[in-house]
Amino acid sequence: MTKWKRANPNGTRDYLFEECTLIEEVEQKLRRTFLERGYEEIRTPTIEFYDVFAFQSRPIDEEKMYKFFDEKGRIIVLRPDMTIPLARVVGTQRCDTPLKVTYSGNVFRANESLAGKYNEIVQSGIEVIGIDNVRAEIECVISVIQSLQKLKVQSFTIEIGQVQLYKCIVKKLSIHEEEEKVLRTYIESKNYASLSNFIRDKKLDRCDETVKLLEKLPRLFGNLEVIEEAEKLASSNEMKMAITRVKEIYEAIEKLGYGSYISIDLGMIQHLDYYTGVIFKGYIYEIGEEIVSGGRYDELIGNFGEMLPAVGLAVQVNQIVKALQEQQEPYERKRIDIMIHYELNRLAEAERLRNLFQKDGKKVALSLFSNLNDTFQFARKNQIVTVVEAKSESLVEYVWKEKWVVQKEGETSCVTFKLR
């Protein structure tokens, strides 16, 4: 029964000290940026009913969910996604739209043990609900670019894709569900040879414009030239409209001066089936890890109430922290400036003195030791150069100068002591 008591479950880890501080700072900077842009905060439970994620299209594999039972025997899951619970809130609470919301929280997914992915991650994100025009996507992209800039993330790019275009191709070529799952992997992984074999085995006409577009899809990544190529092969108004939407977003973001942060990838297909239109993925060049994901999901909220158009983007906080650790100087947590050693009958005075120093921007802590020498040893070990002793009759300040030297003493009041 005690075999695993010293270990972490697969896909999880402990975060200590400086890394915890950095995670908190990233979350808060993201939150501040989103709130400044007019987003309102929503928080949902860490646990949800299984039924919340088990609607018809089953966007999240059942095997990836952590499941258990509540006191009534109902199936509960640790939330594997943030967008679906938000859709539940909006659909059931009948919120006024348009609505801009932001969130931050932990997401849990059971990945394969050797996949190199964490099963618990932190996501901060935004959703624009109730708007079906291109302004919603533009707002989301601008918000995320500005937030990454404020975090000083270097060399990132946000790719713009269009799952609607892919769905139009699949529908027109009458590709069945099981075949589509295989086809999707070929396109996403840009496996040109397997895609060519798929077209051959399906006996699809390579002279057909839609088949040409399908075969070219994994190669359609880059700038606006990609759009021009796709437009030439689009064989329906629906395809053309899907391509035009990507073009409008790209041009709008480029005009703002953010062109270096965006690119187009029409061969990008999100793994979550609830996306219905434009989709996004963000990467950092040096790391190659996904730091942003999202897209348009116009049919998701309808599973919980009124059908409402929506777009969202999630920022992977853990990956941002990893990038910052690699791109910047090693992060050092702020050291304690002053340690206050006190006798128990002087606790109130010690706490007042701590507050006074803190107002001056100092990081101050009360000693946990009853013996002054133990406080001195702790201070030296932790590179604290100032110790203040609150004795019964007076206050004494010690400073480390190859040894502990009395800097000042004699006052009984913390106010007059600090002013000296």
UniProtKB/Swiss-Prot annotation:
<comment type="function">
    <text>Required for the first step of histidine biosynthesis. May allow the feedback regulation of ATP phosphoribosyltransferase activity by histidine.</text>
</comment>
<comment type="similarity">
    <text>Belongs to the class-II aminoacyl-tRNA synthetase family. HisZ subfamily.</text>
</comment>
<dbReference type="Pfam" id="PF13393">
    <property type="entry name" value="tRNA-synt_His"/>
</dbReference>
<dbReference type="GO" id="GO:0006427">
    <property type="term" value="P:histidyl-tRNA aminoacylation"/>
</dbReference>
<dbReference type="GO" id="GO:0000105">
    <property type="term" value="P:L-histidine biosynthetic process"/>
</dbReference>
<dbReference type="GO" id="GO:0140096">
    <property type="term" value="F:catalytic activity, acting on a protein"/>
</dbReference>
<protein>
    <recommendedName>
        <fullName>ATP phosphoribosyltransferase regulatory subunit</fullName>
    </recommendedName>
</protein>
<keyword id="KW-0028">Amino-acid biosynthesis</keyword>
<dbReference type="InterPro" id="IPR004516">
    <property type="entry name" value="HisRS/HisZ"/>
</dbReference>
<dbReference type="InterPro" id="IPR041715">
    <property type="entry name" value="HisRS-like_core"/>
</dbReference>
<keyword id="KW-0963">Cytoplasm</keyword>
<keyword id="KW-0368">Histidine biosynthesis</keyword>
<comment type="subunit">
    <text>Heteromultimer composed of HisG and HisZ subunits.</text>
</comment>
<dbReference type="GO" id="GO:0004821">
    <property type="term" value="F:histidine-tRNA ligase activity"/>
</dbReference>
<dbReference type="GO" id="GO:0016740">
    <property type="term" value="F:transferase activity"/>
</dbReference>
<dbReference type="InterPro" id="IPR004517">
    <property type="entry name" value="HisZ"/>
</dbReference>
<dbReference type="GO" id="GO:0005737">
    <property type="term" value="C:cytoplasm"/>
</dbReference>
<dbReference type="InterPro" id="IPR045864">
    <property type="entry name" value="aa-tRNA-synth_II/BPL/LPL"/>
</dbReference>
<dbReference type="InterPro" id="IPR006195">
    <property type="entry name" value="aa-tRNA-synth_II"/>
</dbReference>
<comment type="pathway">
    <text>Amino-acid biosynthesis; L-histidine biosynthesis; L-histidine from 5-phospho-alpha-D-ribose 1-diphosphate: step 1/9.</text>
</comment>
